[in-house]
Amino acid sequence: MTAGAAAEPATAPSHMTRVSAWPGRIVGLDLARAAAIIGMLAAHVGDSGLRGDDAAGWGWLWVADGRPSAVFAVLAGTTISIMSASDRVGSGHTAVRVATRAVILVAVGLVLNALGTPVAVILGNLGVMFLLVIPAIRWTPRALAVAGSGVLVGGAVAFRFVEGAWDGIPVAEAVTHYYYPAMAWTGYVLVGMAVGKLRLREPAVASALVWTGALGTAVTYGVAILVGAAAPWQTATGPWWASLTAHSTSPFEMVGNTFVALLVIGVCLWIARPTPVFLPALAFGSMSLSVYSAQIVVIAIAGDQIVWHPSNVAFAVLTLALMAAATVWRVFLGAGPLERALTLASTKAADAVAAPRGSGSGPRP
């Protein structure tokens, strides 16, 4: 699994150079994962003119502030539902797999945080969110959507009063930490789980996600601006609860980000095809956990200045280099290194704990 990878063969088939061979994968989700990772790269090292000495960056890069990580979290939830649907052993087996992945995500997050980069690493927080949603694995799409909406709004309001309460407490601080507070961000994962239970291969579902996302984003942003909030690309003003500023964790920001995620996923489901044209992006998205981790390592090696004094040249070079590496890896080796490790570890743990005696594990996402 990347934070959200679907079914993955253990090794690359000999004909992997034909991009039509993406067995078991919903390529639109891989494209959406690629979009989320590129967005986070832009947020970390891209120049929007709002950070560093250069005020002449690409102003439109404001779209990469906060939203890509929300898309990433929604896609993670989508993967959980796809895992559950493909698990022939049962929900208990899926729960152990999700819990194992959660522990590994927390561990990888701690390692990446230890590198001391200025980047707020999402993986540890995402691991905590995985643990929190385990009881919801068998819920219906409607129940997941309602619960997700409640957590997004209710968690955002509650966060206002407990922000940073557990800072300094390893792992637990993920619940109330500023950038990705699990008490609110778990709503993204729940909504993603609802999406993952839909028939994502059907064009009508992609269309519904596009229209829901587009209209929802327009209404949410429009209402927030009408009640006095600044537009997302402007300096923050207005009431806190209507703020559209990235990582403000206001109810409007959380809901708006959710609709943006639905729009991105819907568009990617619409346009993605398993053809050579899409190979680099699909390879990039299919190993998003490995790519995300690699960019943190690169930033650690390059030094903090690559973040505090961003350059769109650095953004473009880093993105293209990682995409090229992912493409070569995918063609010759198949699943990404961290994705493969995550799949093997979670499957073995689940088979040992929850599989009926004598049952075969079969392929796992």
Q: PLM features: what roles do these ranges have?
A:
Residues 2-365:
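Alpha-helical transmembrane segments and their immediate juxtamembrane cytosolic regions
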